[in-house]
Amino acid sequence: MSTRSKSVPVPAGGGAATVPLAVLLRREVVSEKTAAERPELQVGLFSQAKKGEDYTFLKPDCERLPGVPSSSFSAFGLFDGHNGNGAAIYTKENLLSNILTAIPADLNREDWLAALPRAMVAAFVKTDKDFQTKARSSGTTVTFVIIDGLFITVASVGDSRCVLEAEGSIYHLSADHRFDASKEEVDRVTESGGDVGRLNVVGGAEIGPLRCWPGGLCLSRSIGDQDVGQFIVPVPYVKQVKLSTAGGRLIISSDGVWDVLTAEVAFNCSRTLPPEAAAEQIVKEAVQQKGLRDDTTCIVVDILPDKANLTMPHTKKQPGMGVFKNMFRKKTPSDSSSHTDREYMDPDIVEEIFEDGCAFLSKRLDSEYPVRNMFKLFICAICQVELKPSQGISVHEDSSQPGNLRRWDGPFLCQGCQEKKEAMEGKRRSRDSSSRNSGSSE
């Protein structure tokens, strides 16, 4: 079974947002660049189903403020379910709403972009917490992408991945949360009470990938999977980048693609094709090499700021050419975090704005992150319920971190979210490990 969506031009921007005085004074100088930062998107989807547990979310015309075109953005998600489709469907239907709820509605565009990484962490945890009240056995990977102008923010758990090609170079915007890919994640789970190892067979031999027992899940992070253990956390890896005015192409695919194709092969086999045909070609290339052993899904998004040229540039630069021009620039502490300064960076590089993959919730919600006033004093930072003055529990309640963190510093959690945080950190072990001779979840 295959599914497709038409590749149609979609505007991904709106009217001008409020800008600082410094930008207004230089508007004449940068008018061309400002126009180029309202990109056009072309989107393609192709999927071949084996179990019917892959779900996608394509919404190119979102508005964070309903009825305000200047607040427009686009959102795309891929949810690769396992042990049933419940977690994938629930996450698809609720994640974006939870992200928007976690960000104050009155933020300007600059602060909205700065708040997104932390809001996505809160939304992933809330979605997981809410779903686990409804089901125990289902789980899902999540790769969720928000595009606002030339800014791309990606949050991911599991092994579905998002890769960017821009300016002739390839950038990985998500993490692989399989145990085989990270000793750090193996150590975290075992220290929290999980048993990580390979499947035992008759004679004592161990086969297959590293898995967490009980349950046999090969992922250290997902949404759902309550039956495996709370140390399988929904805290996402988040990366935010800003494209140059040349635009780029995103490939978002499930492991059915990445288990067979490298990012280079995926881009090479589809470079001359529009998004719909590119997504189909990538899936068919993967299936042809390995057969249809799993649901195999691909989303391709072309970001085209130059409306005079609706075709992606297809000439890949030769290695060694333009090394500094094509470097993946990461902001340093000396760089201003203001949107004003970001507007005037070298336009020929992909700039890394934010990256964090820590699995510990207290660190991901830390008050040192941008937008210090994002979390209100009497609102739970995760589920957004109102708290009485005596009810809030600081995320630093049990912190042993050095510095000026104090137990009465925010952000604050309600009792239920505090218990969720403790469980994810291994402070509330709900079950003992069981034998590795059982079946596996994924």
From Swiss-Prot:
The family database entries (Pfam families) matched by this protein are listed as: PP2C (PF00481)
PROSITE patterns under this entry?
A: PPM_2
Q: What is its EC number?
A: 3.1.3.16
- Alphabetical UniProt keywords: Hydrolase, Magnesium, Manganese, Metal-binding, Protein phosphatase
InterPro entries assigned: PP2C, PPM-type-like_dom_sf, PPM-type_phosphatase-like_dom
Cleavable signal peptide? none
Q: Where is this region: Disordered?
A: 420-442
Cofactor or coenzyme needed: Mg(2+); Mn(2+)
- Which residues are noted in the entry as Mn(2+) 1-binding? D80, G81
What GO terms are given for molecular function? metal ion binding; protein serine/threonine phosphatase activity
The PPM-type phosphatase domain, residue ranges:
35-303
Identify its protein family. Answer: Belongs to the PP2C family.
Q: What is this protein called?
A: Probable protein phosphatase 2C 15
Supply the source organism for this entry.
Oryza sativa subsp. japonica
